[in-house]
Amino acid sequence: MLSDNPQALVSTSWLLKHLKDPDLRILDGSWYLPKMNRNGFEEYNQKHIPGARFFDIDEISDSNNELPHMVPSAQKFISRMKAMGIGDGHQIVVYDGQGIFSSARVWWMFKLFGKNNVAVLDGGLPKWTSESNPTDNIKPILA
């Protein structure tokens, strides 16, 4: 069990140290405004932190609400997390492709649904890659 960092923000060095921990779940929560002409899922498929799963903010929302990105029901959220291999005993680290933009929204959603072991990666993928930390394009086996 990861317990040496109960903070809401984790450093790239902390994540690198714990990258292979079986209790860690890394989420790429990248989402961009339409005018940015970027696609978080496509970027995830090209390059992500090893072991990261993609958290689709558009899909994990209340699809019955006409407003975009409204919080989903607890049932939908829990169902999607189980499908991603995320359970109560996991430490979650969220990042995004801008540094810290949409990852904060994902963090907030976990907190809203009572998950305390969740943190945002300080500097996100830009900082991670600027430090020459590893990336890959392999989708993890969800367990």
Functional labels for PLM-detected ranges:
Residues 1-143:
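Cytosolic catalytic domains that perform sulfur/thiol-centered chemistry
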